Structure formats: C-alpha cells, structure tokens
A protein has these predicted regions:
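Hydrophobic alpha-helical segments within soluble ligand-binding/sensing domains
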Residues: 32, 74, 131-158, 203-205, ...
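Flexible loop/hinge segments that line or gate small-molecule binding clefts
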Residues: 101-138, 159, 255-261, 312-315
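Short, low-complexity disordered leader/linker segments with a strong preference
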Residues: 1-31, 56, 104-111, 318-319
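Short beta-strand elements at the ligand-binding edges of bilobed clamshell
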Residues: 64-66, 122-148, 162-163, 194, ...
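Hydrophobic alpha-helical
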Residues: 91-108, 179, 193, 197-260
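Extracytoplasmic "Venus flytrap"
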Residues: 31-58, 62-80, 84-86, 92-96, ...
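Short, solvent-exposed amphipathic alpha-helices that sit
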Residues: 43-58, 139-146, 170-189, 203, ...
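Hinge/cleft segment of the Venus flytrap/periplasmic-binding protein
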Residues: 163-167, 171, 182-183, 273-319
Length: 319
C-alpha cells in the first residue's frame, strides 16, 4: 500500500542553472543510474521492484547495479554511471560515511545525485540534490514509545535485547538513537544485549540464539527490521519460549511476513518503513532533468501497527 509522501519545509534547491541532459541513451529518454544496497531482506526486494516497475512505467531507462552490501561496489557503480554519462544517479548508501570523493566526481561531471532510503553524513549537502526516504530516528522513537506505553503500569525492570542493522548504516544508527532517546528517560528500561545481525533473517536467528544462551531474562526484543525479527522468532521458539508473550517483539519495516507474524501473536508491534519509493523517485528524476526546483528532504509518511490491527491490514500489504 503506497503511503502519501510528506514534503518537509526545508528550503527548495535548484538542480542547476540549466536543465540536465538526458544521458547517454542516444535519444531523448532519461537515463537513471541506480545503485542498490543489495537484496538482504524482503523490504529491499520490494524496494528494488518498486524502482524497476516505476522506471518502466515512466519511460525512464534504468541502469541498475546491486552492491551486494559492499560500499566499494557502490562507489565503482557510481563511477561507471559517471563514465556512461547517465542523466541522473540515485543510490541507497550501504553506510553513511565515505562518499564525498565519488559524489564530488559526479558533481564535477554535472550529474545530479538523489539519495534514496538512506542518507550520507557529508557536511557538503551540495553533493546531492535531495534525500527521499524515512525518518529513521523517528521510527526508533515510535518503537520505544510503544514499549513505554505497554510498560506504564509496572515498575519492574524491562530487559531489552537489540538486533541492530548493518554497522554504520543510517537506519541502524538512527533507529538505535531514536529508541535510546526515549527509553533513556526511565531507568527501568535496560538494554542488556545489543549486536548487529546485518538486517538478515539468518543472522537474526544466529545472534538471538547467542543472546538467549547468555541471557535467560530477556523481556523484549527490539529488531531494526522485520527479517531479523523473524529470524529471532525461530530462535525463541527453538528455545522453548513463546515470541510475543514470553518475549515481546518490536520490529520495523512492515512486510507481509511480519504482519502475518503479528496476526499469529508472535510480533507485538511493527513500525512501518515504506519501501515503495519508485514512483516518487521517478517523479523527482523528471523534475531534476527538467531543471525544476526540488525539496532537499522528502519524508515518507508511515504508521505504527499492533496485533489488533494486523489481521485487517494484512490483505493490503503488497511486500
């Protein structure tokens, strides 16, 4: 289900004094070079499909590169796009840092860059035109706010295990930051175990097994994405515990599999992160090529879903 997009009140930026060229396709067709993080999760697969389908529908030629979770692969892909003289470059950064050099190369080549899903930590914001994606800090806050509300009638200590996303990635850093920002106000909330599980189901299970071996007093699992949460559910069940009851589970993304797990009582709450960015990305790409002003930040509007909403919402999940 596509969510509407909210445009922040950031100042508008112009792509260039003149319209950007259409790229090296040899026609008037716009060429978009896109470097994807990888295919590490159901969310990412849905994101890729959304971009591919939207490009075809918009008549935009898409040059697609899968970075396989490696920054060096993305840098290589961006340099290839520069050499190919594409009209626009878009990418979802594997990690937040280390992009200035290659983005400066794109800027020098007068090829505008769009960030999708994830941000970069560059101090020079002129290196990209806009950032389209979720507010990951707010997602972390929403996850924590649910836990605070669910725990408000007890003064007992709440022991939390955290499955982090890829180390150094914007969603992992920001979802942790937002969550801690909220729970840090009450000393009864304690993170007793926290480790990366690389946003994958297999690692989610593996790391959760280690958590359970070291800590038999975990009350809550906070997973930075659904795939890690679903892997952790397997580990919890194999340990003879009931996910959603013995250990409450908070996850982020909103995939169909997670909604099914919520409907089954195994996940307690999911904070939505919408992967269907393709149509908006193509709209932005056309604006950039035409030289139209573009907001510096475009934030997706997303919800929070609990078990009592899961069954009704499940048929609407398209990913």
């Amino acid at each position: 289900m596509l969510k509407r997009l909210l445009i922040t009140t950031s100042a508008l930026v112009l792509t260039a004094a003149t319209a950007v060229g259409c790229g090296s396709s040899g026609s008037d067709q716009t060429v978009l070079g896109f470097s994807q993080v990888g295919a590490e999760s159901g969310w990412r697969t849905a994101n890729t499909k959304s971009i591919q389908d939207a490009a075809a529908a918009a008549g935009i030629q898409l040059k697609f590169a899968d970075a396989q979770q490696k920054q060096e692969n993305q840098i290589k892909a961006i340099r290839t796009f520069i050499q190919q003289r594409v009209g626009v470059i878009a990418f979802s950064p594997v990690v937040a840092s280390g992009w200035d050099t290659v983005l400066k190369e794109a800027k020098d080549a007068k090829i505008p860059v769009i960030l999708t899903d994830r941000a970069v930590d560059s101090a020079d914001t002129s290196l990209y035109v806009t950032f389209l994606g979720s507010d990951f800090v707010e997602e972390g806050r929403r996850a924590a706010n649910w836990l605070v509300e669910a725990s408000k009638n007890s003064n007992d200590t709440v022991n939390i295990a955290e499955l982090q996303g890829t180390t150094g990635s914007a969603p992992a850093t920001d979802r942790k930051k937002g969550f801690q920002e909220v729970i840090g106000a009450d000393p009864k909330f304690k993170i007793i175990a926290s480790q990366t599980a690389e946003f994958t189901r297999a690692k989610g299970k593996e790391v959760m097994q280690a958590f359970l071996a070291a800590h038999r007093d975990i009350n809550v699992l906070y997973a930075h994405n659904d795939d890690m949460a679903l892997g952790a559910i397997q580990a919890i069940e194999e340990a003879g515990l009931k996910p959603g009851k013995d250990i409450k589970i908070i996850s982020i993304d909103g995939t169909r599999d997670a909604f099914q797990a919520m409907a089954d009582g195994k996940i307690n709450v999911v904070v939505e992160c919408n992967p269907l960015l393709g149509p908006k990305l193509m709209e932005i790409t056309k604006d950039v090529v035409a030289g139209r002003p573009t907001p510096k930040r475009i934030v997706t509007d997303e919800g929070v879903y609990t078990q009592d909403q899961a069954a009704a919402a499940l048929p609407t999940r398209t990913y």
